[in-house]
Amino acid sequence: MTMSIRYLLTALLGLSCWLGNAQDLTQPPFTPAAERMQAYEQRQQLQASSIINNIRFTNVGPTIMSGRVVDIDVSPNDPTHFYVAYASGGLWRTTNNGTSFEPLFDNEAVMTIGDIAVDWSNNTLWVGTGEVNSSRSSYAGAGVYKSTDGGKNWTYCGLGESHHIGRILLHPTNKQVAWVAALGHLYSPNAERGIYKTSDGGKTWQQTLYVHPNAGAVDMVLDPGNPDVLYASSWERERRAWNFVESGEGSAIWKSMDGGKTWAKISGANSGFPAGEGVGRIGLDAARTANGRTVLYAAVDNNNRRPAKEGESDGDKLTKDQLRSMSVEDFAKIPVYQLRDYLQANGFPARYTPARIKEDVAAGRIKPATLAGYNEDANSQLFETAIVGLEIY
C-alpha cells in the first residue's frame, strides 16, 4: 500500500503524457467546405420532401435570450436603421431603433458571423461568416456572402475554408474592391487564411498576405486619409478540445502601401511593439489628426510573463516557476525548510515529507516539475500565471 502511494505522482504524470500523445494521434480531420455545402444542399432537399414541410410552426418562447453581438452597422443618415450580427444567431435589421427586428440570414448555409460591412449608398451588404473568437463554442463559417438588395437575396462569394472571418473592409469609392481578414481553421492548420482582396465585387479573390498554417488575419483597418494604405494584424493560435495556445511568433502587425497587394511587417524586436511567442490577438484602429497625420492604435493580448516589479520578490520561498525549470542536481541543494514550507503551502499530504520527496526525485521516480503541477488545473493556471495581459500601443 505504501509503495502504491509513493508511485502515485509518477503514475499520474505518465498517464497524463500518454493521454496527451493519444489525443494528438486521434485528432479528427476537418470537414472540407465542399462537403459541408453538399450536406446543406442535402438538408434542403430533405426539407422540401418532408411530409411536414407545409406545416407552419410558431415559436412561442422563450424569447428573452441572446448571444454574442459581433458587429453593428448604423445608417449614416438614419440612426434608427441598423444591422446587428451575432456570433451564432445570424444577421438582423431594424428600422425603428430596435423596437422590432427582421432576420435576414435564416435561409443560408450557416448562421455564424464574424463581421459585416455595409455600403449604405447602394444597399449592399457583405457578411463574413464564422465567429473570430477562438472558444470551443466559436463555430466555423462557410466564407463570404453578399447582398445587393439590403439582405433580401444573397450570393455566395467563396472562401469556404476561411472558417473564421475577422474583418471585411470596403473601398470608399471603388464598389468592386473589398478586403477580407480570414483567421482560418480553429482546430487544424490550413492555407486559406490571411488577407484576401477582390477587385470584381467578390467573384474572385487574391490572397495577398499569408503568414503560416497556424496564423491568420484577425483585424484590419484602412488609413482614414488614404484607401491605398491598410494595416492588418495576424494572430497565431491553436485550439484543441483540451488545450488552447493563444499566442506565437506569427502574431504581428502588417502594413500595405499599395491597396493591399503587398504587405510589410511593421512590428518586431526593434519596433517598440511586443514580439515573440507571447504575442496574442491584436485589435487595430486608426484615426486622423487635425494636422493630417494618421495615428494607429493596437490593443494586444500580451501573454509574455509579467516582469517582477522593483522590490517585488518571493523572498526565500520556493516557487512553482523555479520547480518547473529546476534540475535534479539543483533540487538536491534545496534546504529542507524551504521544501517543507512549499509542501505545506500547497496542500501535500503529511506523508510526503521533504526527505521522501528528495529521495523520489534523486531516484528519478518524479521530477521537480511534478511538484509544481501537483494541485494545478486549467483554472488555477489561468489565474495564477502572471502575464502582462492587455496593452494598448
List the predicted regions and their residue ranges.
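Bacterial Sec-dependent N-terminal signal peptides
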Residues: 1-26
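Beta-propeller blade termini and top-face loops
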Residues: 23-393
